[in-house]
Amino acid sequence: MSYYSGYSGGLGYGYGGFGGLGCGCNSIRRLGCGCGSGSYGYGSGFGGFGYGSGFGGYGYGSGYGGYGYGCGRPSCCGGYGFSSFY
């Protein structure tokens, strides 16, 4: 696990980013650990908080900028609540 630039211009740690498995922290707005895109892990994708994957995995958290439980694709962008892999 090495440092990388986060999902979108933030400092973070982990590995992967867009499309591999691997988690890192922080992205744009809030601190939060999570995967970049198409993986699984713990944290938010873009700027929220919670656990889950960023774009197309599975877990507990939000995809883009809110918080919720299991977001998949941008169906949960900027929102919160239950969501699935669409």
Swiss-Prot record:
Gene: Krtap16-3
InterPro entries documented for this protein: KRTAP_type_19
Tissue: Strong expression in narrowly defined pattern restricted to the lower and middle cortical regions of the hair shaft in both developing and cycling hair. During hair follicle regression (catagen), expression levels decrease until expression is no longer detectable in follicles at resting stage (telogen).
Annotated GO CC locations: intermediate filament
Record keywords: Keratin, Repeat
Organism of origin: Mus musculus (Mouse)
Summary of subunit composition and partner proteins: Interacts with hair keratins.
Chain spans, region 25 X 2 AA repeats of G-[YCGS]: 6-81
Family in the record: Belongs to the KRTAP type 16 family.
Expression induction or repression: Expression in skin and hair follicle is regulated by HOXC13 and by GATA3.
Name recorded for this polypeptide: Keratin-associated protein 16-3
